[in-house]
UniProtKB/Swiss-Prot annotation:
One of its GO terms (biological process) is alkaloid metabolic process. It catalyses: 7-methylxanthine + S-adenosyl-L-methionine = theobromine + S-adenosyl-L-homocysteine + H(+). Theobromine binds at residues 157, 160-161, 368. Belongs to the methyltransferase superfamily. Type-7 methyltransferase family. Its EC number is 2.1.1.159. Gene3D superfamilies: Methyltransferase, alpha-helical capping domain (1.10.1200.270), Vaccinia Virus protein VP39 (3.40.50.150). Keywords: Alkaloid metabolism, Magnesium, Metal-binding, Methyltransferase, S-adenosyl-L-methionine, Transferase. PANTHER family: S-ADENOSYL-L-METHIONINE:CARBOXYL METHYLTRANSFERASE FAMILY PROTEIN. Involved in the biosynthesis of caffeine. Catalyzes the conversion of 7-methylxanthine (7mX) to theobromine and with a lower activity of paraxanthine to caffeine. Does not have 1-N-methylation activity. This is Monomethylxanthine methyltransferase 2.
Amino acid sequence: MELQEVLHMNEGEGDTSYAKNASYNLALAKVKPFLEQCIRELLRANLPNINKCIKVADLGCASGPNTLLTVRDIVQSIDKVGQEEKNELERPTIQIFLNDLFQNDFNSVFKLLPSFYRKLEKENGRKIGSCLISAMPGSFYGRLFPEESMHFLHSCYSVHWLSQVPSGLVIELGIGANKGSIYSSKASRPPVQKAYLDQFTKDFTTFLRIHSKELFSRGRMLLTCICKVDEYDEPNPLDLLDMAINDLIVEGHLEEEKLASFNLPFFTPSAEEVKCIVEEEGSFEILYLETFKAHYDAGFSIDDDYPVRSHFQVYGDEHIKAEYVASLIRSVYEPILASHFGEAIMPDLFHRLAKHAAKVLHLGKGCYNNLIISLAKKPEKSDV
């Protein structure tokens, strides 16, 4: 089965769906000030046609209500900054392209658009038709838009997904090289970590080169992804998956060869690795780069626009929160895991993951690191 066929969130609106488990959480809330600053710099740059129509893309948008909450933040930031900077009575039209792979559940987003537009008009004063939302399916490691047609590209929790499993893992190192793990973890051998870093370097370089061509000169890009830091000693969500899978092997429910032959196309870079790749590729100037921590159960925070899921108790002990963590991780990773390990074992897998999450939460741990980077496309020499 092709990777792009299984690299998507759980579809629909069931208890294990991404739509029901993802939420506007504290991690995304921390991004909003950076988003506003990025929009402020964008509007000051006075790019072509920006006063009439601002063209934006959300790369790796996923599905469900959370997608439109990101769109809401972008629209609110544009309107807020526009009023502060230019005090314009006539707001520019905002055209937003939602991008993800072809198998993404775009329909779950489209169904929410009528109510989203009405709410935007009621709360932001944006008339229906002044914010245009459409889909642009396809891999963001390939071209999506015409040259010099976009003002702002946004991506949150997507660029850590690779275009493929590092080829060197199996071809050069052999099956089972990454023993006991499904990704490039702290426990992985140096050759495995290098194979993953090489693939990320190749993919992220391609990402920057391709999308720099789609942006106007001095256009902006804001990226957020999970990252690693040297002193970080807490298990992240993928470490919990490793623990749960190894439990099933020890208990005899899963063959060790199944784990040995599976590697997730996912890499958590360090801030320095990202910085070096951007500088080496050369199309962008780094405006700022920061890291911040988010907690596993950050999604328990309540957003007025996001009703809390009824099948979870918002306030409770570690076991209740651990169930939420397990369901959220399941909604993201189940399709690709089920394609390799089988659907039948998924309930047991995430039941064990919840137990490990509860232990981590009980110890007062359970954070993962995030990286946010703001980039400006360097002007061509003729534009200087």
